[in-house]
C-alpha cells in the first residue's frame, strides 16, 4: 500500500460519503423496509463525532452494493490527501469555460496524452514559436543591416 491509512480521518470521510449518498437519495442501508433503513440512517447521523463506531455501523448496516464504490472514493481521497502534503504532487484547479475544456480534452485525446501533458505541450509549442519568431526577426534585421551597408 502506497499511502498510510489513518483510521479516524478515513472514518470521517466514510461518514461524509454515506451522508452525502443518503441526501442524494441513494439507498445506503442493507434494509428493504423503510422504517429499519431510516432507523439505521438516524443512527449513522448520530455518529458524526465517533469515527470508530462509524466502521461498526458500516459492517452492520451498509448496503453491500455501495461498499466497492465507497472504497474507491476513500482510496482516491487518501491519495489526494497525501499528495497535497507536497507542492510537486499537489493538484491545482483552474477555471475553464466548457468550450475551452472540450477543445482541450479533444486535443488531449487525439494526442493520446493527459490534459496536463497537453497543456505543457501547448506551452512548449508557444515558447518554441516565440523563440523562432525572435530568431527570424534578428536574422532579418542582421541581413538588412548587411545589405544596407554595401
Curated annotation (Swiss-Prot):
GO biological process, one term: cell division
A family per Pfam: MatP
Keyword Cytoplasm in annotation: yes
Predominant location: cytoplasm
Gene3D superfamilies with a match to the protein in the record: MatP, N-terminal domain (1.20.1270.380), Met repressor-like (1.10.1220.10)
GO terms for cellular component: cytoplasm
Keyword Ribonucleoprotein appears in the UniProt entry: no
Keywords from the UniProt entry: Cell cycle, Cell division, Cytoplasm, DNA-binding
InterPro entries: Arc_rbn_hlx_hlx, MatP, MatP_C, MatP_N, MatP_N_sf
One MF annotation (Gene Ontology) recorded for this entry: sequence-specific DNA binding
Protein localization: Cytoplasm
Self-association state and partner proteins as the record states: Homodimer.
Function: Required for spatial organization of the terminus region of the chromosome (Ter macrodomain) during the cell cycle. Prevents early segregation of duplicated Ter macrodomains during cell division. Binds specifically to matS, which is a 13 bp signature motif repeated within the Ter macrodomain.
Family listed: Belongs to the MatP family.
Annotated HAMAP family: MatP
Name of protein: Macrodomain Ter protein
Organism of derivation: Salmonella arizonae (strain ATCC BAA-731 / CDC346-86 / RSK2980)
Amino acid at each position: 500500500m502506497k499511502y498510510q491509512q489513518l483510521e479516524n480521518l478515513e472514518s470521517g470521510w466514510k461518514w461524509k460519503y454515506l451522508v452525502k449518498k443518503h441526501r442524494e437519495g441513494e439507498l445506503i442501508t442493507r434494509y428493504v423496509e423503510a422504517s429499519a433503513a431510516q432507523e439505521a440512517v438516524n443512527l449513522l447521523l448520530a455518529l458524526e463525532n465517533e469515527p470508530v463506531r462509524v466502521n461498526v455501523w458500516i459492517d452492520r448496516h451498509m448496503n453491500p452494493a455501495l461498499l466497492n464504490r465507497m472504497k474507491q472514493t476513500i482510496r482516491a481521497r487518501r491519495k489526494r490527501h497525501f499528495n497535497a502534503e507536497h507542492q510537486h504532487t499537489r493538484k491545482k484547479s483552474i477555471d475553464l469555460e466548457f468550450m475551452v475544456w472540450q477543445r482541450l480534452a479533444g486535443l488531449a485525446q487525439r494526442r493520446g496524452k493527459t490534459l496536463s501533458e497537453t497543456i505543457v505541450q501547448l506551452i512548449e509549442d508557444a515558447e518554441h514559436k516565440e523563440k523562432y519568431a525572435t530568431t527570424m526577426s534578428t536574422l532579418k534585421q542582421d541581413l538588412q543591416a548587411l545589405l544596407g551597408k554595401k
